[in-house]
Amino acid sequence: MPEISRDQVAHLAKLSRLALTEEELEQFAGQIDDIVGYVSAVQNVDAAGVEPMSHPHSIATTMREDVVHKTLDAAAALDQAPAVEDGRFMVPQILGEGD
């Protein structure tokens, strides 16, 4: 079974922009290693001839009545926004012009 090192967890944390303590790095290395072991065990199960399914039990689709409820109006939603322009949410630009 592959062992996940503390350095690999530190690298993943850096890529994810997570600040982890040394204790957390050791803890997560063990937990991730356990998860990899569980996945490996599942991959080794002989599932030949097993029909794919979404749920182990037969469940009839249940439908609920479509009822219209009062929702938040635009003015109330915009009232909670940090920035509004021309009646719309104003957000920072993430793409350059022409993108």
From Swiss-Prot:
Q: What class of enzyme is it?
A: ligase
GO biological process terms held by the UniProt record? glutaminyl-tRNAGln biosynthesis via transamidation; regulation of translational fidelity; translation
Domain of life according to the entry: Bacteria
What reactions does this protein catalyze? L-glutamyl-tRNA(Gln) + L-glutamine + ATP + H2O = L-glutaminyl-tRNA(Gln) + L-glutamate + ADP + phosphate + H(+); L-aspartyl-tRNA(Asn) + L-glutamine + ATP + H2O = L-asparaginyl-tRNA(Asn) + L-glutamate + ADP + phosphate + 2 H(+)
Keywords attached to this Swiss-Prot or TrEMBL record, sorted alphabetically, are:
ATP-binding, Ligase, Nucleotide-binding, Protein biosynthesis
A single MF term (Gene Ontology): asparaginyl-tRNA synthase (glutamine-hydrolyzing) activity
Matching Pfam families, A to Z? GatC (PF02686)
- What EC number(s) does its UniProt record assign? 6.3.5.-
Database matches in HAMAP family:
GatC
* Family per record: Belongs to the GatC family.
Q: PANTHER family this protein is in? A: GLUTAMYL-TRNA(GLN) AMIDOTRANSFERASE SUBUNIT C, MITOCHONDRIAL
Describe, as the record does, how this protein assembles with itself and its partners: Heterotrimer of A, B and C subunits.
Q: What does this protein do?
A: Allows the formation of correctly charged Asn-tRNA(Asn) or Gln-tRNA(Gln) through the transamidation of misacylated Asp-tRNA(Asn) or Glu-tRNA(Gln) in organisms which lack either or both of asparaginyl-tRNA or glutaminyl-tRNA synthetases. The reaction takes place in the presence of glutamine and ATP through an activated phospho-Asp-tRNA(Asn) or phospho-Glu-tRNA(Gln).
This chain belongs to the protein called Aspartyl/glutamyl-tRNA(Asn/Gln) amidotransferase subunit C
Originating gene: gatC
